[in-house]
From Swiss-Prot:
Pfam families named among the record's database cross-references: HOK_GEF
GO CC term (a single one): plasma membrane
Localisation: Cell inner membrane
Purpose of the protein: Toxic component of a type I toxin-antitoxin (TA) system. When overexpressed kills cells within minutes; causes collapse of the transmembrane potential and arrest of respiration. Its toxic effect is probably neutralized by an antisense antitoxin Sok RNA.
Disulfide bonds: none
Top-level taxonomic group: Bacteria
Listed name of the protein: Putative protein HokG
Stretches that traverse the bilayer: 5-25
UniProt main location, coarse: membrane
Record keywords: Cell inner membrane, Cell membrane, Membrane, Toxin-antitoxin system, Transmembrane, Transmembrane helix
UniProt gene name: hokG
Signal peptide: none
Keyword Transmembrane helix belongs to the record: yes
Length: 50
């Protein structure tokens, strides 16, 4: 039963991150969230075509 809730929580978290990424689109270069003793950091690295 606990694993069912854990799986649902992971799916919800992934959908939230995916939705946020789609909303900000091209302007996302770095996202940093700090809460208590944890830090979550996502960095988008790319090379633009010239």
């Amino acid at each position: 039963m606990l694993t069912k809730y854990a799986l649902v929580a992971i799916i919800v978290l992934c959908c939230t991150v995916l939705g946020f990424t789609l909303m900000v689109g091209d302007s996302l270069c770095e996202l940093s969230i700090r809460e208590r003793g944890m830090e979550f950091k996502a960095v988008l690295a790319y090379e633009s075509k010239k």
